[in-house]
Amino acid sequence: MFLMVSGFINYSQQTVRAARYIGQGFTITLSHANRLPVTIQYPYEKIISSERFRGRIHFEFDKCIACEVCVRVCPIDLPVVDWKLETDIRKKQLLNYSIDFGICIFCGNCIEYCPTNCLSMTEEYELSTYDRHELNYNQIALGRLPVSVIDDYTIRTIQIKFN
């Protein structure tokens, strides 16, 4: 009879322990149920980028003086600047300016050291294409005004705050 009573006590202790573990699991589950979802439904929801985000480079053709500082400070000598010297006015005339975003590392040196501020970073980060040659942007593509995520009414924007 003693074995039967000790077996019953052991069984009841194991049952209480199992119920406690299940209760702990439920409390963890319920504490996570009140949180906002971490997953962002990408094409329909986008994160608002920070002020210092390094996206696509915007180029203003009229401000550029073809000094080639951007080429000298670039760690991979990426910007291609074509110019000709106008002898009558003794100034460089910019002919073509292009950047290949397939190679660009978005370090921001060209923007930081540009004396005329003709280069700036935008918040655009969707540069993917099926053909890598489409990532070579000339002055016309670089001069296109940046598309703001906030202005698109079809997309729900999400502000993420880091602690």
Curated annotation (Swiss-Prot):
Signal sequence annotation: none
Sorted UniProt keywords: 4Fe-4S, Chloroplast, Iron, Iron-sulfur, Membrane, Metal-binding, NAD, NADP, Plastid, Plastoquinone, Quinone, Repeat, Thylakoid, Translocase
Reaction equations catalysed: a plastoquinone + NADH + (n+1) H(+)(in) = a plastoquinol + NAD(+) + n H(+)(out); a plastoquinone + NADPH + (n+1) H(+)(in) = a plastoquinol + NADP(+) + n H(+)(out)
Top enzyme category: translocase
Residues binding [4Fe-4S] cluster 1, per UniProt: 64, 67, 70, 114
GO molecular function ontology, one term from the record: NADH dehydrogenase (ubiquinone) activity
Entries under Pfam families matching the protein: Fer4_7
Family that this chain belongs to: Belongs to the complex I 23 kDa subunit family.
Name the UniProt record assigns to this protein: NAD(P)H-quinone oxidoreductase subunit I, chloroplastic
Species name: Glycine max (Soybean)
Higher taxonomy: Eukaryota, Viridiplantae, Streptophyta, Embryophyta, Tracheophyta
